[in-house]
A protein has these predicted regions:
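Bacterial N-terminal signal peptides that target proteins for export
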Residues: 1-8
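Secretory pathway targeting signatures of secreted, lumenal, and periplasmic proteins
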Residues: 18-68, 97-98
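Surface-exposed amphipathic alpha-helical segments
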Residues: 26-33, 116-149
Length: 149
């Protein structure tokens, strides 16, 4: 029994040392909820409205997602995680599905070996502005892209 108990304590201490990484806090006034998916080398956070519509996705990774962002699709200037960036219309190979005009994507290099990929799926121009403001104000936990995440 003591061996089992010490094994359980070791496992609990190990789990506490590798506490799960969380998505940035969303303001209560946003009415959004995160759905979080943790993988070995990245974290995906999907923000949805009360009716389940996904309006923002955020991927934090140690690897550059290597998404080509064409200057011709560049739109608004913004910031994320303290870094200046631009929002782009996504390159959908010439397709323009409903709501395309308001969709935005960006990749931000936060520091050495830390990247954020942000995508917005607003239902209107007004919602797009609100989501850009929300993204700009997000506070990233410095361990959000810790080693091994």
């Amino acid at each position: 029994v003591p061996v089992l108990l010490s094994s359980l304590l070791f496992a609990a201490a190990n789990a506490a040392a590798q506490a799960p990484v969380d998505c940035p806090t969303l303001p209560a006034s946003s009415g959004l909820q995160w759905q979080q998916q943790v993988q070995s080398d990245f974290l995906i956070c999907r923000a949805s409205t009360a009716d389940g519509r996904e309006v923002l996705s955020l991927m934090l990774s140690q690897r550059d997602p290597n998404i080509p962002l064409s200057r011709s699709l560049r739109e608004e200037k913004g910031s994320f995680g303290g870094e200046s960036m631009y929002w782009y219309k996504p390159d959908l190979g010439g397709q323009q599905p409903p709501g395309y005009a308001e969709r935005r994507i960006s990749v931000v290099k936060l520091d050495k070996g830390r990247y954020a990929q942000i995508a917005l799926y607003p239902g209107s121009t007004q919602e797009m502005g609100s989501l850009q403001q929300l993204a700009q104000g997000m506070s990233l936990n410095p361990t959000a892209v810790a080693d091994g995440r």
